[in-house]
Regions:
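Helix-to-loop junction immediately C-terminal to a conserved catalytic motif
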Residues: 50
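Catalytic Walker B motif of ABC-type/P-loop ATPase nucleotide-binding domains
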Residues: 152-156
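Conserved ABC ATPase "signature" region
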Residues: 97, 108-123
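Conserved ABC transporter NBD signature motif
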Residues: 58-73
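The feature captures the beta-strand-to-loop junction immediately N-terminal to the Walker
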Residues: 35-37
Length: 213
């Protein structure tokens, strides 16, 4: 069963064609990878799937609902697109508490659990501005998972992590898959994609050039 279906997708911004007739399905319960150089269109495709950008042509359905028609932003989805933005003078926990308050249905236990699952100490008082890049990336993932979504959309989840951090993140993402989650990863690293993903989709100049798996 497909959780994401992309049909004949085109995206043109200021007379520049960003995506060209992209056709791809992503099966539920698997880890899928998008790989390509800067400017290949992979991040723009993810933003279209998330509902952040409306495509010029084509149809995207997520969990059976058409994005932009039946639903503006797909529900039950955790997202990290580019660098997560946090309030620099708040702790990681306080940032997540603020976001949880805006969403209105996430308790302290869910926040603590999401931070601990990605290797962050929820009692740490350090301001986010003093976090390493890797710690901010982990905090972004904690934000994405704190509502226990079925689908995760992750742009460069390994960015800023050291060797041990990358290994831990890979193990954690694989454990999410084992628990029935679907994950779509965008990465420059072919190694991360090859190790983690059941399917690998390569993009170049807005065109889907190769699909493996």
């Amino acid at each position: 069963m497909n959780i994401i279906e992309v049909k004949n997708l085109d995206l043109t911004i200021k007379k520049t064609q960003i995506l060209r007739n992209v056709i791809i399905n992503f099966e539920k319960g698997k880890i899928h990878g998008l790989i390509g150089r800067n400017g290949s269109g992979k991040t723009m495709l993810m933003k279209c799937i998330c509902g952040f950008i409306r495509p010029t042509l084509g149809i995207i359905t997520v969990d059976g609902k058409q994005v932009g028609k039946e639903v503006d932003f797909p529900k039950n989805m955790g997202i990290i697109i580019e660098a997560p933005g946090f309030i620099p003078y708040y702790s990681g926990y306080k940032n997540l508490r603020l976001l949880a308050g805006l969403r209105g249905k996430i308790g302290k236990a869910e926040i603590v659990q999401s931070m601990e699952q990605v290797g962050l100490d929820p009692t740490l008082k350090r301001h986010v501005r003093k976090y390493s890049l890797g710690m901010r990336q982990r905090l972004g993932l904690a934000q994405a998972i704190m509502e226990n979504p079925d689908l995760l959309i992750l742009d460069e989840p390994m960015n800023g992590l050291d060797k041990d951090g990358v290994s831990d993140m890979r193990k954690y993402l694989l454990s999410l898959k084992e628990n029935g989650k679907t994950i779509l990863i965008c990465s420059h690293s072919s190694e991360d994609i090859e190790v983690l993903c059941d399917t690998v989709c390569e993009m170049d100049k807005g065109i889907l050039t190769k699909i493996k798996g």
